[in-house]
């Protein structure tokens, strides 16, 4: 594990604990082997003035929704430590009450909600506290003899806490087990199946303890020859990828983006004989279930059957673990293990799919580490369910914001007019679509490769935007339609949009040609929109007129 500390840079913050906290937090966030996409949390304890100018012992802890790699001072929530210490002494505390009490303990109401680990940070008696979900630590703890391995490696240098639900339950357990402990005797604290804490009154020491302990864990794995992942080769037919993405979208009820990881490491894992068994035992850490569900789908040659089986098993999982009042989430997988192709992740947009993809990549790597140590043993499903369906996440279901109109849709823009191509791309992206654009004059020569590039990048094709045809051979459309049609057939609410600066009669002629072409191809269900560049004249397939007119306004309005 690389030590990224820079004395010269840190010197600029030596007299400002909050800025120093930002600096060291970003150091941790820059290392994906420590944290991923909002994971982990950090804090600093200092005296701050309240509204009346009174000095108050304050915990500045990472706020919900912030990423350690890019966090700013505004991303830390300031809370009164005396209130947090009182909360730690309670026998019980619901998640909603914990959030409410933490909000009331804030010195700044504009700050984000504090991390659910705020109480735990408060009771650790050091100025700086760092918490990560280090892969090497998880590889050791998620094994049959994880506790013995941690004790063998670290001895009495770390406190070891058995797994318990994150939030108040964890803070309470740590409080009870350590209230008589001499914290100065320890360099860190390992949470089984969860992660690791380090702490110090010195920011550099706390950070370097994290790097040191994780490096020792990596060296332990190296000595056990547990670091080398399987490698493999394979290939994916774009049509089968589009078909898989269509099946997932249909089951989820909304279009999704599919991101295929066909790296040698991803294919190597997918090709393991026991990948379907070890890969579906459980998540790397329980919080990953919020983004990626408890397990992935293992895809057989009949991917549709695999998805149906996954959905049935997910509903059974919910039924086994649910209690009154819970709302079942959709039963669609968030990622999959695909022999011969690699790992595939699904999301409502490219960023969401990439986050899940990163989780999948790190999970499969750690699974192999743990298997080399004697066997991958993640948390039992009831513990994972408790996190996936915990109170705070269920509350979000009831207050979710409306999605962008084209969220999850995938578009290819193949226009010879660069300005119009950029205009369309900007509007489609703003509406939530994943967009690939080619704006060279030679779009006809590039359309075939552009279609495949779009499918391999995002999983399919729903919208083709191309030039209006002005001659009897339907011009550029003669090249673009045959290349795109097999994928549009597998799209979600597929449509073809032709744009051009020409007369109403020319637009109408082009519209009729496209409709006829689709009908002759047996694909009359694909929507057609033909419009001039200022959207003053538009021809739309009658059965989709209302929806398509709104869409075309979004993507062509000048």
Where are these regions (language model features)?
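Glycine-rich flexible loops
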Residues: 1-411, 423-427
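Hydrophobic/small residue at the entry helix of a nucleotide-binding pocket
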Residues: 420
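Conserved Rossmann-fold SDR core element
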Residues: 432-435, 460, 492-497, 518-556
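Rossmann-fold cofactor-recognition segment
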Residues: 434-446
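Amphipathic alpha-helical dimer-interface segment in Rossmann-like NAD(P)H-dependent oxidoreductases
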Residues: 472-492, 503-521
